[in-house]
From Swiss-Prot:
The gene is porB. It is an enzyme of class 1 (oxidoreductase). It catalyses: 2 oxidized [2Fe-2S]-[ferredoxin] + pyruvate + CoA = 2 reduced [2Fe-2S]-[ferredoxin] + acetyl-CoA + CO2 + H(+). Coiled coil: none annotated. Heterotetramer of one alpha, one beta, one delta and one gamma chain. This is Pyruvate synthase subunit PorB. Keywords: 4Fe-4S, Iron, Iron-sulfur, Metal-binding, Oxidoreductase.
Amino acid sequence: MAVRKPPITTREYWAPGHAACAGCGCAIALKLATKAFSEAMEEKYGDPNAFAIAQATGCMEVVSAVFPYTAWKVPWIHVAFENAAAAASGVEAAWKKLGIKGKILAIGGDGGTADIGLQALSGMLERGHNVVYLMYDNEAYMNTGIQRSSSTPYGAWTTTSPPGKYSIGEDRPKKWVALIAAAHQIPYAATASIGNPFDLVKKVKKAAKVDGPAFIQVHCTCPTGWRTPLEKGVEIARLAIETGMWPLFEIENGDIWNIKIQPPGGGAKVYKEGGRVVRIEFKKPIEEYLKYQGRFKHLFKRPEAIEELRNQIKAMWKVLGVEAILPRPEE
């Protein structure tokens, strides 16, 4: 009988027994990312363990390293909320001086990356350190009480952007850190999602193999902060892709005129010119994504807010060079 090879290594670097919430999308992301990283290290250096992790304070740090226990099965250092990129830069410089072959993986959430860690990240990218920075994006400061971050999407409820008579919730557009990273002319910048795990694995391996800095912004569902059913995390993340709320793209060597777009699926029609995606007609409205999430429930009483969100998503796709056609539920 033929034996099928697993699509990814069975080695574990993010071990079971951590304290993440049931249904945590970020835990899925880190499990897949560390497996993919080890495969890349084995292919590049002949050693699957040729990497170390520098991790910022945040959800995934808190749940993985409650002293004296840890879920990490790889050299790992916990640093402050804002300086995972700086610490990773130092480790990388030390490895280079000592002649150690391998790569550093820096990990931070959206608060520790898009907000208070942005300066350290920019410095790491600009200096050209051989580090992959993985931003797990659950779109708020979930660890400290579901406060809004600059990565929180427009209209979302958080404890610091509550909807009410004079508020629709978060009133700022989402910050796309992957585009900021790409502006540093680094070898590789991308977005990924637990809604497309094979794409996530492929991009982590690609980032790990480049010489120089790389950045990946990974969309992760959060049942606690998003007020979603525990069992629907991957399905909801997939809906974000299929409705246009979360684009999957990659930018190599800062070439923003040649952004590679991963087709969203979900029945969307994709049009290309010269091999480049220029137009996507989405079949599913963004309401299909919003309706599962308690953080957006108030928007269904404010159709003008949903329309504003739809316009912001179109504008984001325009930045990527793509005309996005986003249907309404009645269409």
